[in-house]
Amino acid sequence: MSDEFSLADALPEHSPAKTSAVSNTKPGQPPQGWPGSNPWNNPSAPSSVPSGLPPSATPSTVPFGPAPTGMYPSVPPTGPPPGPPAPFPPSGPSCPPPGGPYPAPTVPGPGPTGPYPTPNMPFPELPRPYGAPTDPAAAGPLGPWGSMSSGPWAPGMGGQYPTPNMPYPSPGPYPAPPPPQAPGAAPPVPWGTVPPGAWGPPAPYPAPTGSYPTPGLYPTPSNPFQVPSGPSGAPPMPGGPHSYH
């Protein structure tokens, strides 16, 4: 008896696999009923099923397009499209060049009408220093300091300040003013002396011309809102207690 165990010994006698294996087995070939390599029997052997598309299929004949590639096939690719980049800016002019010089206008515009008319309102005069002549041609020559004239004053030229409208008072001597004294008052008396004469007013105050009326009872003026007379006692207050007789 052989020590090697055969798969044909484990199958039943009438198994078609055993019959075909026994009858069609050739030296150096595996049985036809079993594949040459099985990943279950030999995990390290590569699978006999080809991966990917069959050799006869092309990407154009696949109904769903070519198979996606990359780490994330479902994400569309990003970035510029394949191919050479387009030139920027585009070559050539963006707008056609002008056809030539523009023609002269057929209707000429209005030309200058001449000197401008005299304004209705004179121009305001510029401020000038006090005493300067109104006519600039009458101004004298200016010295190195600007407004100060280097020569004598010409007749008609004003000074730095205008002439006052009211003449100044003369600086002559004035008489001493008299001391202030009220009319009818006594002359001043040196300190510490008593003036002669009686003290007090010159005459007593006059007596009143009439006597004041004696205070007394005066008649009450008529009151249109008098309370009608009633029983003795104070009238009852509104809302107060009432006496029943």
From Swiss-Prot:
Record bears the keyword Phosphoprotein: yes
Modified residues (N-acetylserine): S2
Entry keyword Acetylation: yes
Family annotation (InterPro entries): MISS
Protein name: MAPK-interacting and spindle-stabilizing protein-like
A Pfam match: MISS
Keyword annotations of the record: Acetylation, Phosphoprotein
Biased composition (Polar residues): 17-26
Modification type Phosphoserine: residues: S2, S6, S15
Biased composition (Low complexity): 34-51
Biased composition regions of type Pro residues, renumbered to the chain: 74-127, 164-190, 198-207
Family of this protein: Belongs to the MISS family.
Region (Disordered): 1-245
